[in-house]
Each structure stands twice: as C-alpha cells, then as structure tokens.
C-alpha cells in the first residue's frame, strides 16, 4: 500500500466481521455477511470520505466484494482489480477432486452453525496456520507483523463466526444475487498467482471473467510469476507493476 499511496489516495478497510471492523448480526439467510452488504459498507465509507468515484483493488474475499461493488454501484467504480479469484458461481459449478481438496474450507465453512465454530475453537491458531500455510509459499509469505494481525483476529470467536457467515452467504444468497445477471461495466484487471489454484485452472482466468462483463474487452489480466495465492506477499514487484500500469498516474 505504501507504494500505491505514493501516487494515489489509498483507503484500506477491513471487511465487516474481519479484523477490527464491527461484527453485526447475520440473519437467518446470512444476508448480513453477503457480498452485497459488504459492498454497501465500502460504498458508504467512500461516500463518507468524500469520494464519489474511485478505483477498487481487492484480494480473495475482498475481491469478491470488489466484484459485487462494481455491479451494485457501477456508477461509482471507475475500474477494478480482482486478485486471485474466479467467480463464486464458477467455482461451485466446476468442482472436481483437485479443487475440492484445495478449497476444502469452502465446504467446511458453509456447514450450519455451530459445527465449524466448535471444531475450529479446539485450536484456532493451529487451524489458522494450517490454512494460511496451505496456500502459495505457506506461512513464510507473511512477515511477523502480518501473521500477528491474522492471529489476533482469529483468536476472537465472534470474528471466526463472522468469517463463517461470509462463506455461508457465499453458498446461498450471494449466488442468488449473481443470478440477477448484472455485468461488469468498468475496466477490470484480473491477476492471479502462476503457482496457485487459480493459476492451475484449466480455463484461463481472463476467459472465465470476460463473459461476466458487458463488453469482454473490458477484462484484461495476467499471471504473476513465482507466486501462489498471496500475490503481494510473494511477488510484490510484479504485482505492483501490473497494478500501477492499470491504475495510471
């Protein structure tokens, strides 16, 4: 962020339920942690700060919120960058053995409360380390300060429940919202780790995303070499180069 902040005004937020953000009730349909609700949060933050139009960069769950933000608030999103994700509905529609093993947590996290909550509570930090360690370069990709921030958040049972509600929404109400058929209308950069799960997808990620845009030409992208899921941590120079070229001066 420091490098981007040298050229741009950077607003970095924790999604609702994550980090130090509030953890509001979810509701029976998990709508409180839907990407639509989270996108509305981000739009509200930017309005409060006085930014009517803006570019958005998101990674992982943040990228899914970025996608929904660009759909629900298309008039405000000038351009967006999606880091290391495939569309949620695409993932669920293309599950095979390899994907199920790599993304096992998607199917564990969506189980009804409080089964995942209780199981993770047995040793949350161990589970966090195993989860982070299974992606890309493993725990070595994260410096001590970043890992401590993950651990602090994950030690909070309410934060873990909020995270699980996010995934439960992803398997339910978020898919209903996707079925509404809105399409991306802003220039979209798709970046993925060459060595990660997204990078190993049989269909190139840009080919997956282009049908979800009003004009397929809006979607461009590239693999980040020598990187898995955590692009910034594993290859900052290449990720930053792609982002700065896309975002402009």
Positions of PLM-derived features:
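Short amphipathic alpha-helix adjacent to the substrate-entry channel of hydrolases
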Residues: 1-9
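Flexible "cap/lid" subdomain of the alpha/beta-hydrolase fold that forms the substrate-access gate
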Residues: 11, 18-57, 61-223, 232, ...
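Conserved short acidic donor-positioning loop in nucleotide-sugar-dependent glycosyltransferases
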Residues: 227
